[in-house]
Amino acid sequence: MALTYSSMLELGSKMPHFELKNVIDDKMYASTTLLNKKPSLIMVICNHCPYVIHYHEELKKINHDFGDNIDFVAISSNDIINYPQDGPKQMKKLFLDLGLSFPYLFDETQDIAKALKAECTPEFYLYDNKNMLVYRGRMDNSSPGNDIEISGNDLRSACTNLLNGSTISSNQHPSMGCNIKWK
């Protein structure tokens, strides 16, 4: 595992178009379903990264707290030939075991990860209801082994401010985690 930081996609960027399979129900899920409805949180994650695993419970809490007003979508873009634990069957099992209820999409071509300029897992991209990027970066400043309590403060603050119509600080911190496993 190589510790990698996110590249911080430019704020105001439009959400890239995607149409990917949701491994939970095997149906196609398109970004067009998110257009001009409510805000969206796209999370680039995977199954095996300790930095993603570190946030499983907090991710469930954030989804519980904001899921009625923000569409949550997780995407895994890792190479499954060399990392079979990140394959669709394992993705589905993980989400069902965790009790997560939002789509978990498989980006087999890695095109969406590239469009988002994703570098690591996890990365979080919060889009307003016009599909413009308003937050990108970390969930909080905790990480495996640093003894800082998981709070989700950075991501929670961005979600709260977006929903309240308040300004989201442009002073945002990159996420850090495992590098995306490119083909």
Language model segments and positions:
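Chalcogenol-based redox active-site neighborhoods
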Residues: 1-171, 179-183
